[in-house]
């Protein structure tokens, strides 16, 4: 059956290559894996296996000029940092971030919503200004989540338990943020919680499949991709559940709600934005993909960093004991701001282990001429090589070294904080459309790591040659090791959390 479908797809790809793959390109260097005499289609097929090396080679050779990478189903124009500095304030009608994200995340299969920045408005206008009022709610739900996800250790055995660190922090983050996104009535619904976490896993596994085979293949064969099928069913369940909640709230307008679903309902401008199914879809998409998955990845990286260095772990634990002298129940926005060592580690961990090689992904909608005369053309997809820039020793001293307290040397100023977006901290994006949820993410990571440090000891179940479980590199994406097993046990002297 697959062969019957593979033949027409193969013919389409061959025609695409003949028509487009051999067209003369504009005069910027193309970074290739294979000799120029061979067809570029071979470079596209092998991009995922060699992406990190190709990006690094292109950056080192053409640091101050654009260069082209041949991805499976697109050309990516990699622009230098000075171009991003010029383009940082350009609006989305000229440089489109939404469609770029749609393409990069197999949007036709994963059904990422296009055409609206409603979620950005909700975070910028409602969530971020309300952080002082929102954080106590988040912390209360996180307290409940720890009781559900980790054993209380009241049997006196104090035994080590085996956990998958990614799944552990994914579940904690899902439970804590659900209350901020869907409110009290639904946030502890176990089916909703499991569906949301599973949707996150299935969506990103589908995206990984797409990056291996290309959007065309993935879209054509989506019905046979198990993770895509499961994610579609989960989306329908959430649309029914949250869509019904939107309609219920409209019928009971005297009720007061203060969550992401409600903010989007109130801020929706167009008829399409206001549809209950669209509101539900957007809430699930942002919750599972933009919040839960990325937070869980960052937390897993940080946990591995601490596990691989006992002195680092103990130094961070002492900081927590000094900041929260009577236990985790004292945690507040101010105490989290006082966690300077942890904040520095978070930023350094993300610098070395970002979610990918690139940020500032955009599709060009209008011709733009840069200061040196180079023109961005409509239809191009552009990005900046954030990992290469932030590990460049000409821009940052000893940039190749992992120094967890590197940013303490800057006296903990706002510009060196984890959540700051700048030319030295590019992985939250850059400019007008930098990640709006980075502030709540920072508090979430600190709250979870703080409690783990104060109340649990942890170590790897098995040794790795480098002591730290190696990252999983898939194309230009970087993931924490999801196969490593961590052992946890409660520390004997901890403050009981009610």
Curated annotation (Swiss-Prot):
Heme binds at residue 435. One of its GO terms (molecular function) is heme binding. Pathway: Secondary metabolite biosynthesis. Coiled coil: none annotated. It comes from the Eukaryota. GO terms for biological process: secondary metabolic process. It is an enzyme of class 1 (oxidoreductase). Keywords: Glycoprotein, Heme, Iron, Metal-binding, Monooxygenase, Oxidoreductase, Signal. The keyword Iron applies. Its cofactor is heme. Belongs to the cytochrome P450 family. This is Cytochrome P450 monooxygenase ltmP. It comes from Epichloe festucae var. lolii (Neotyphodium lolii).
């Amino acid at each position: 059956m697959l062969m019957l479908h593979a033949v027409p797809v193969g013919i389409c790809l061959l025609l695409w290559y003949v028509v487009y793959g051999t067209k003369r390109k504009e005069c910027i260097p193309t970074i290739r894996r294979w000799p120029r005499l061979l067809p570029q289609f071979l470079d596209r097929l092998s991009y995922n296996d060699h992406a990190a090396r190709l990006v690094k080679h292109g950056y080192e050779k053409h640091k101050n000029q654009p260069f082209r990478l041949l991805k499976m189903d697109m050309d990516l124009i990699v622009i230098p940092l000075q171009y991003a500095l010029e383009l940082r304030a350009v609006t989305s009608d000229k440089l489109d971030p939404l469609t770029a994200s749609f393409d990069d995340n197999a949007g036709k299969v994963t059904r990422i919503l296009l055409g609206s920045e409603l979620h950005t408005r909700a975070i910028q206008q409602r969530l971020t200004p309300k952080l002082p009022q929102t954080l106590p709610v988040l912390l209360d739900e996180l307290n409940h989540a720890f009781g559900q996800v980790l054993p209380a250790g009241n049997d006196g055995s104090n035994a080590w338990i085996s956990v998958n660190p990614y799944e552990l922090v994914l579940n904690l983050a899902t439970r804590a943020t659900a209350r901020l996104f869907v409110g009290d009535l639904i946030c502890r619904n176990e089916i909703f919680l499991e569906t949301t976490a599973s949707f996150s896993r299935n969506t990103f596994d589908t995206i990984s499949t797409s990056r291996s085979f290309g959007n065309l293949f993935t879209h054509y064969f989506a019905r046979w991709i198990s993770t895509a099928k499961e994610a579609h069913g989960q989306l329908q369940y959430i649309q029914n559940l949250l869509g019904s909640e939107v309609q219920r709230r409209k019928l009971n307008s005297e009720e007061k709600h203060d969550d992401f679903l409600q903010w989007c309902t109130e801020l929706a401008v167009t008829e399409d934005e206001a549809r209950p199914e669209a509101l539900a879809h957007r809430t699930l998409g942002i919750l599972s993909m933009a919040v839960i998955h990325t937070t869980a990845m960052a937390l897993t990286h940080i946990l591995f960093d601490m596990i691989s260095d006992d002195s680092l772990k103990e130094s961070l634990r002492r900081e927590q004991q000094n900041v929260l002298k009577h236990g985790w129940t004292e945690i507040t926005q101010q105490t989290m701001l006082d966690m300077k060592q942890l904040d520095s580690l978070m930023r350094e961990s993300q610098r070395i282990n970002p979610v990918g090689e690139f940020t500032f992904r955009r599709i060009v909608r209008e011709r733009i001429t840069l200061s040196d005369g180079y023109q961005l053309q409509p239809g191009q997809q552009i990005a900046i090589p954030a990992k290469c820039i932030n590990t460049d020793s000409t821009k940052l001293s000893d940039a190749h070294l992992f120094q967890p307290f590197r940013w303490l040397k800057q006296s903990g100023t706002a510009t060196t904080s984890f959540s700051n977006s700048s030319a030295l901290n590019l992985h939250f994006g850059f400019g007008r459309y930098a990640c709006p949820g980075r502030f709540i993410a920072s508090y979430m990571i600190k709250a979870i790591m703080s409690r783990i440090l104060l109340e649990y000891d942890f170590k790897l179940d098995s040794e790795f040659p480098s002591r730290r479980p190696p990252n999983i590199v898939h194309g230009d994406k970087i993931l924490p090791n999801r196969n490593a097993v961590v052992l946890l046990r409660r520390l004997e002297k901890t403050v009981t959390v009610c």
